[in-house]
Amino acid sequence: MRFAALALALLATQPVAHAADPATPTVTLEQAMADPDWIGPAVDAAWWRWDGSAAYYMLKRKGANIRDIWQVGIDGGAPALVSDAGRTDMDTAAVIEFGGARSAFIRNGNVFVRDLHSGTLTQLTRDNQAAERLQWNRSGGLIWQVGADWYRWDGRVVATAAQPRADDAPDAKPPVDDLRDHQLRLISTLADDKARREAMRDQTEAWRRADPTRPPAPIHLGKDVTIVDSSLSPDGRWLLVVTTAKGADGGRGEKMPVPVTESGYEEFEDARSLVGRNDPSPQRLWLAEVATGKVRELSFDILPGIKDDPLAALRKAAGKDPLKGNRPLQVGSGDDVPAPQWSDDGHGVAVILRAVDNKDRWLVTVDLANATLQPRHRLHDEAWINWSFNDFGWLPDGSTLWYLSEESGFSHLYTLRGNQRSQITDGHWETSQVTPSRDGTRFYFLCNRAAPIDYEVCDAPASGGAVRELTALDGVEDFSLSPKGDALLVRHSAAYLPPQLSLVSAQGGPSRQLTDTRSAEFKAHRWIQPQYVQVPSKHGASVIWGKYYGPANPEPGRKYPIVMFVHGAGYLQNADMHWPDYFREQMFHNLLVDEGYIVLDLDYRASQGYGRDWRTAIYRWMGKPELEDYRDGLDWLVDQHQGDRDHAGIYGGSYGGFMTLTALFQAPGVFKAGAALRPVSDWMQYNHGYTSNILNDPELDPEAYRRSSPIEFASGLQDHLLIAHGMIDDNVFFRDSIQLTQRLIELHKDHWQIAPYPMERHGFIHADSWLDEYRRINELFEANLKR
């Protein structure tokens, strides 16, 4: 269905949500919180068979943590489990040679090549190492990485291609040492022995260089660095290396107690450090010529704005010294930011550089001959650069770069050819998951163009032109092009449909569903369909998208108690049309409606899917705009859905737990009860990467931390609070809730309780814990919202 066609139905004043059919058993709390195996497994990942005749996908095995591989033909037929023997001839996600004759893939850490004409499979490696980063070159050769080293295959033999090492070269000149020089001058035997060693070394190296059967010598970066990452050109000529200072201090890490163990003794795990204890270590970028071993550092001086300090005012106010020289940077290496991308011909390489202060991102190319950077694009954000939408790459012509940028306020796709820049997508919607066609003439990508909550596969010409929506599935998760480029394997979902597979022509058109892994029991339930709503903002935020759950036919004159749900992560979208991350909570909301509540789940400011300004609304003051949005949502429920303002509750986990604390502490009396699950109560206790983006460094911006941390406002608690937290949570430490507990004790607060879960981490995995937690939440609401 198309969202545009449904807009009036979905957003009409009368709710489209319905109560359960009396003939259908109402979901119980035990069932909602049970092991989700009863629902049926979601399609975890999917990829094409090498000839495009079938799709492989992964499903969790019932009653186990094992993921089995299944196969389904694209022309129909029942899905089948891939046998143990069948797995030996199965390709995983492959990279296709430039000419389209062969593909390469990694299975169980080993490298394989498939002839796409004959189907012949050739195994290139057989070891216990883990290969990664496969790439073809224009000569039909293949390169890949294993650990720090690189390997190549030229069609005949697998050979070492490059070996970066964090040590000094054997012929490196030693530091000046007067005593050593004195000894060599006086003792001729010492000098003669030294000369012989050097002559042997030089001769050995000369023989190595003259012998094409020998691998290149290791590339020495020096003993004062630690190698973070490296990237080899497809032709094997050049190696980019990312380093940091040896022994760089990452800050004091935590020791997290584990109380319930197999050994019977309390144990301790190493855990992360806290925000601001030490900034991420600055990194350097080097260019090495593989054949000669010559290494040159790539200077960052040329980057526009590299010496500017966006935090100068805060630094001055905090009494800190002004920033001197270049701002410290980190190099994209495939974690939060993509690794360097080489063109297939090996002549071009692009790299993402990101300022440690989170305010700038540079896309650069490298002049390989002169070992200099060439700035191609700078993205600056007064708040912080998004950790999403940093994708980039090359088109097959080897000279056109593509990249994503939020510079317009929304993530969009751009191309760069020389100095000519073109914007391929535009509008108040987001572009993501970009895949160029194999011939480089088109881009395929996800877009939420029809509505922020509706995700489809779209395409556009690489030269610019109209954007087309190729699917009409509303909840596309991801997709992959067929080996021939004529079809799309689409993973999609819906409110009560875990991710499934469908097939769509690459030109668009109707889809054909290939899988439905839901159980008969789950499908038999007549679930309450969420109503996708737009809540008017009274605080200049336009509208706030959300999901409303309520009775199909409200009783005239009746006021309904209210429950408001707050999703986690902050930057996450939960009011979209996908299968929710919070599927258990969605079933709980069904139960709440059956018990007489109405429920609203909002994508508050800070959520994903609504552009840069929505994302950064919380900069330097987490909790303020989100609470405004929830109070607007409360007003809307009272005005539009017979909500009882005097009997409203709120709950959520992680960021949702933080917001529950914020609501109860800073808006006392608005919510009569709240359940804060695994909450952040003090942002000084959270990690650096997430927190410093939004609140800066605590030494520079202490006010941002004070006004954003609920523990600072705990004196405001007057309503009923449940805190629930896993004791081995290595994301939001259980200690955070312990400190809040102590603060509430010191403040002589009552009407609160804490429930610890000794064997749970940030995301609960045991059904018993889920049930206990949500039984407590349900009892909290029943006791305080219906009186």
Language-model-derived ranges and their functions:
Residues A5-T13, A19-D478, D486-A487, A495-P499, ...:
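Beta-propeller folds
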Residues V476-R787:
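Serine-hydrolase catalytic core recognition
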